[in-house]
């Protein structure tokens, strides 16, 4: 997001970029090919059937209108009560069909949204896409696309799609009536006579076509403006969420003035785009209002044209009213195309944002560094050069081999690439060159700031596994061992533990996770930075005591941790890092034999 006078632009607003996106059918078709989708398709057929039944009721009402006014014109007042009763019964049946169709449509909408949300969420979480998207800033506001755009896309697709399916039936049905009732139109030009059959039908189509073309010309920018509005609203919401998440830090810095400025700058984009959208919508609404005013006078035209037939006795009063009703039904049905134009522009914007999400989540992730599995539990690197996304070199890591059961301390000045090395070992950093060998399973990564999910404290301790995977007694014992005895009775208390626990307490929870998972290889990235030196020693001692055969790779700054490692990897600045054996602490570690958890875990 930028803060200058120009709007930030993303690929969903760029026509050239949109050509590389998957076709919209990738969003529309997959659900209907599933077993759940087949049942929803049956429900959708019932909805379409109810729509066509409503059209039949409208046709019946059209015929009823003719009979009603014919009875009045012929002074046959005795038949009026019977006609009114029949009208009431048909109206009640039509209302029941219409309401049933609406309920079924809502059910289909809920089912489709649930499936599409699950499908897109799986794509977001697959292959670490969620991390790659944020790391490389490939997409903004993914949460808004899945939560909000999916809801709007499903709703608008059903509304527009069902409208497109019902309009032809209504138009054809009433066009037949209008063609029959209208008769031929004779014109005399230069002594020649011309006859035009179904002239009222052609007039209705020409009238609606002109309105649609004019509406598109006036509102064509709405697609881009709507997509931009979704993004700008999402950017503004992200800033407010950040204030909530880091409320304490902002309060310590007294940064409310700065945050207010950032929020105002972001919201200025929102307001500017709203005004631009308002201007376009006003033009469209003004035109539509004029059309609506003219439409109220349109029935006079077929009445005047058919007046000679009425005066000559070739057309009854009921026939005249029936023709006017049919003309209104045809123009009203065709009006769907220009009345639904704003909805169509919103649908296009929603579809483009979801297509962009598919484009980003489905392309093969970049992986310049070769990753291989270690059969012996060793961790090794050869020819490893770490780069940033632009290709600039961050650090050159010397070749090293860490045998199973050994413990290595990675040291160096801040910013020299230590944490990036651990990301590369985890397979989360693709930029660079060289080869990495690591165990395929039984590994556990502890970043400096661990993720604490909302829910119970036990769920936070057992993450990423389910809370039911471990007994309460084991979790309580680990809380006591890791210096969290005060929280042991609160194991099943639901809370936002990420805000309730201090930074040091969160790092203690992370150590409890490691001891609970019993991995064979542990990677620690300054995961005790919020603890005092004594607490740090106690947790490292507990780790070695409980996992004596585990391979450990630690990134840390404190020299006191040398006593808990037998190998170091130094990153001097600005020279290249060099690996060496610490002769004073040289010990031969045992091969890894601890119980391995499933897969590589980042917590």
Please name every model-derived segment.
Residues 1-58, 67-87, 101-105, 130-171, ...:
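Membrane-integrated ABC transporters
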């Amino acid at each position: 997001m930028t803060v200058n006078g120009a709007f930030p632009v993303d690929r969903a607003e760029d026509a050239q970029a949109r050509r590389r996106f998957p076709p919209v059918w990738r969003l529309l078709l997959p659900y209907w090919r599933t077993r759940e989708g087949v049942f929803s398709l049956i429900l959708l057929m019932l909805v379409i059937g109810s729509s066509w039944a409503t059209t039949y009721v409208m046709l019946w009402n059209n015929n009823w209108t003719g009979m009603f006014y014919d009875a009045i014109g012929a002074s046959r007042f005795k038949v009026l009560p019977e006609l009114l009763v029949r009208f009431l019964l048909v109206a009640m049946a039509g209302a029941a069909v219409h309401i049933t169709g609406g309920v079924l449509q809502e059910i289909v909408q809920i089912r489709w949204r649930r499936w599409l949300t699950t499908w897109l969420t799986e794509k977001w979480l697959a292959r670490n896409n969620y991390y790659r998207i944020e790391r490389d800033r490939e997409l903004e506001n993914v949460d808004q696309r899945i939560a909000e755009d999916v809801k709007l896309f499903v709703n608008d697709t059903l509304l527009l799609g069902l409208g497109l399916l019902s309009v032809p039936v209504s138009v054809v049905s009433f066009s037949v009536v209008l063609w029959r009732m209208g008769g031929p139109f004779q014109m005399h030009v230069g002594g020649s006579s011309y006859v035009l059959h179904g002239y009222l039908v052609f007039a209705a189509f020409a009238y609606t076509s002109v309105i649609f073309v004019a509406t598109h010309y006036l509102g064509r920018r709405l697609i881009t403006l709507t997509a931009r509005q979704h993004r700008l609203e999402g950017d503004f919401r992200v800033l407010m969420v950040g204030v909530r998440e880091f409320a304490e830090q902002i309060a310590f810095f007294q940064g409310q003035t700065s945050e207010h400025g950032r929020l105002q700058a972001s919201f200025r984009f929102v307001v500017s785009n709203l005004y631009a959208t308002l201007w376009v919508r006003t033009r469209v609404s003004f035109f539509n209002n004029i059309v609506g005013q003219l439409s109220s006078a349109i029935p006079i035209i077929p009445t005047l044209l058919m007046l000679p037939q009425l005066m000559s006795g070739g057309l009854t009063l009921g026939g005249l009213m029936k023709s006017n009703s049919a003309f209104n039904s045809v123009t009203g049905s065709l009006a769907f195309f220009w009345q639904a134009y704003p909805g169509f522009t919103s649908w296009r914007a929603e579809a483009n944002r979801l297509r962009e999400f598919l484009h980003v989540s489905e392309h093969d992730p970049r992986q310049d560094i070769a990753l291989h599995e270690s059969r012996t539990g060793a961790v090794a690197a050869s020819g490893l050069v770490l780069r940033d996304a632009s290709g600039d070199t961050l650090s050159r890591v010397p070749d090293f081999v860490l045998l199973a059961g050994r413990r290595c301390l990675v040291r160096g000045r801040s910013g020299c690439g230590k944490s990036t090395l651990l990301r590369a070992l985890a397979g989360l950093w693709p930029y660079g060159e060289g080869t990495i060998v690591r165990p395929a399973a039984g590994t556990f990564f502890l970043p400096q700031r661990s993720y604490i999910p909302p829910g119970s404290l036990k769920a936070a301790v057992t993450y990423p596994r389910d809370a039911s995977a471990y007994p309460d007694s084991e979790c309580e014992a680990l809380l006591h061992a890791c210096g969290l005895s005060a929280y042991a009775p609160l194991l099943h208390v639901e809370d936002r533990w990420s805000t309730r626990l201090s930074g040091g307490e969160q790092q203690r929870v992370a150590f409890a996770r490691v001891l609970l998972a019993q991995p064979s290889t542990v990677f620690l990235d300054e995961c005790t930075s919020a603890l005092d030196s004594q607490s740090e020693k106690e947790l490292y001692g507990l780790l070695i005591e409980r996992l004596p055969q585990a391979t450990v790779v630690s990134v840390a700054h404190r020299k006191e941790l040398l006593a808990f490692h037998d190998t170091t990897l130094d990153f001097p600045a600005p020279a290249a890092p060099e690996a060496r054996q610490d002769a004073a602490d040289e010990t031969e570690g045992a091969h890894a034999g601890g119980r391995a958890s499933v897969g590589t875990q980042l917590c």
